Amino acid sequence: MLQHLRNRASIEVLGKAIRKYNVPESANQLLIDMGFIQPSMPGIFQYLPLGLRVQNKICDLLHISMRSLGASAISLAHLSSKEIWEKSGRWQKTGSELFRLHDRNDREMCLAPTHEEDVTRTMATIIDSQKQLPIRVYQIGRKFRDELRPRGGLLRGREFMMKDLYTFDIDKASAMKTYEDVLQAYHTFFKEVGLPFVMVKAATGNIGGNLSHEFHYRHPVGEDVIYTCPSCHYSTNSEMLDLSKTSSDISCPNCNDQLTSTTAIEVGHAFYLGKIYSSKFNATVEVKNKQEVLHMGCYGIGVSRLIAAVAHVTKDAKGLVWPSSIAPWKVLVVPTSDNHIQSAETVYDATANVVGFDNVLLEDRQNRAFGYKMRDAELIGYPFVIVVGSRFQEEGICEIIVRSSGERYKLDKDSLHQVLLGNFL
């Protein structure tokens, strides 16, 4: 029975082997070549098993993050009516980036790039008492934007996966408390992902409102320019600055030190919306015989963009290097030959009992040279590889290879799992 429950490379849909492969500069191309995603048309990608596993790991962390805020999961329709977008004033304002279509009755609608209109109209029919507040609802789903020039693979596509959180509070003070709570939850989430990030002040743009922050990974491939103070760590997006000045004149508003700039990839954002949408869609509650318009916030994390951003930030000369928190598999168990598959199964079972069966993959593809398996492991970027060979049969010794550092540990089978649990995972 256990044999059929093991995660086996022999039955997984993995990328096809490439005999001689030079790691490309583009992390997006590496994701394609290694079988994480496959391009369908410009800006549109199919997710293969490895890519879907990374996406699901990110979503698992997001569900935990949202539950920590007391948020409830919902699912809003991909199609959104022209009427509610006209009501908010964004039907024309959004312009050509909006995918517009007609049904057979000539009703106009769009593929939603965001859901402020729909969620506000929906929640306005549900919220009828101050006692229900605060309300926090979120969804993880696909969004659509008709990009003129899709680029960067998953970094800027025409179809993408987002986590959206929408919040409703009775007044501005309560909404500001919610805003700070969400920023803290985002900090915790990005720390769980495991890469250095920067939170910056940002412009509100087409969404509206008067307060916004963004979360970024520093990387040359990014489209944003962020400015940071080396003294007090104040950070802001370039949109918030007067760039008509020379770089030496751009100083920190807090301590007056000179700001330094870097390119970055935006992976998350927060907006305080105030009453922009709630006033238009009658999201109100009665307080002391008076209807009070609710204060809203919206908060997003780009799931598909995060996959690409992490790939770009961590990629090295040998391939991808996934943080263990979102890796498709945290541990790969590799026998040195087909003769050692049974021993590898023993190590797999013991390891899976400690770190979880969904975190371990057994490299049991037969008639495939050990060197090719190890090269695949480097390219795909499994955080930890356990090599099982003749020394395990003779002495119970395995080797653990840490992908991010290249460190190798030779350990007996009794201490193997203690090290994995205590130091690695």
UniProtKB/Swiss-Prot annotation:
Belongs to the class-II aminoacyl-tRNA synthetase family. Its main location: mitochondrion. One of its GO terms (cellular component) is mitochondrion. It is found in: Mitochondrion. PROSITE patterns: AA_TRNA_LIGASE_II. Its EC number is 6.1.1.15. This is Probable proline--tRNA ligase, mitochondrial. GO terms for molecular function: ATP binding; proline-tRNA ligase activity. The keyword ATP-binding applies.
